[in-house]
Amino acid sequence: FEKVLKTIPEDIPIIADAKRGDIGPSSKKYAYALLEQFGCDAITVSPYMGYDSIEPFLNYKDKGIFVLCLTSNSGANDFQVPNLYLQVAEKVREWNVHSNLGLVVGATHPERVLAIREKSGPMPFLIPGIGAQGGALEKTLEAVQDGTRVPCLINASRSILYPEKSVVFNDFKETQEFSSKDCISSSRHAAHELHQKIRNCLEK
């Protein structure tokens, strides 16, 4: 993790998708490690254990804290729906006294995004699920913005890390020939395509 961080240019914000959330003393150590020791600019946290598990992160007023609200995985329906995600959005709005809180809202639930926005008010959304999970980018952005132009961050992981999933290697030699340079080029192309797709949605 530390080696990866060292390769990131200083002007690029680093969000640790750590999903931390534990009893107060443990959360305090997690917050110190990720936000101070490693110097991440933001972190994702789980609200399931309540305010005292989140408070140590909130004390870092110059850091961004994204709270899991409605996640992009299919298991989100087990507990978060039908009402828990709305309670989270409302509660996080109360906790946002330093204006450094945001919500993690999956793009796989575009029909629920507007309800979250109504509960949360104008706080940033971190939106996963656009790539490999097949989230609805355009519908999600329409609901998130809703005429407010509130900032949101689109997260894509697997679709950029593994853009060549359709490539089938017949033997180890072929795998070697598909060099790291090819991987970087493919990932760069996938990121550019997503960036353009987002721009097109916002310009409509």
Kindly give the residue locations of the regions a language model identified.
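Hydrophobic/aromatic residues located in beta-strands of well-ordered beta-sheets
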Residues: 14, 65, 103, 125, ...
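Alpha-helix-loop-beta-strand connector modules within alpha/beta enzyme cores
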Residues: 1-16, 120, 125
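Active-site-adjacent beta->alpha loops and helix N-cap segments on the catalytic face
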Residues: 1-7, 23-27, 48-62, 108-118, ...
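Conserved anion-binding
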Residues: 18, 22-104, 122
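A C-terminal functional module that forms or caps the active site or interfaces directly
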Residues: 107-155, 159-166
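A short alpha/beta connector and helix-capping loop motif
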Residues: 1, 5, 22-41, 139-143, ...
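C-terminal helical cap(s) of enzyme catalytic domains, especially alpha/beta-barrels
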Residues: 140-147, 151, 162-204
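Alpha-helical scaffolding segments of alpha/beta enzyme cores, especially the outer helices
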Residues: 2-10, 29, 33, 56, ...
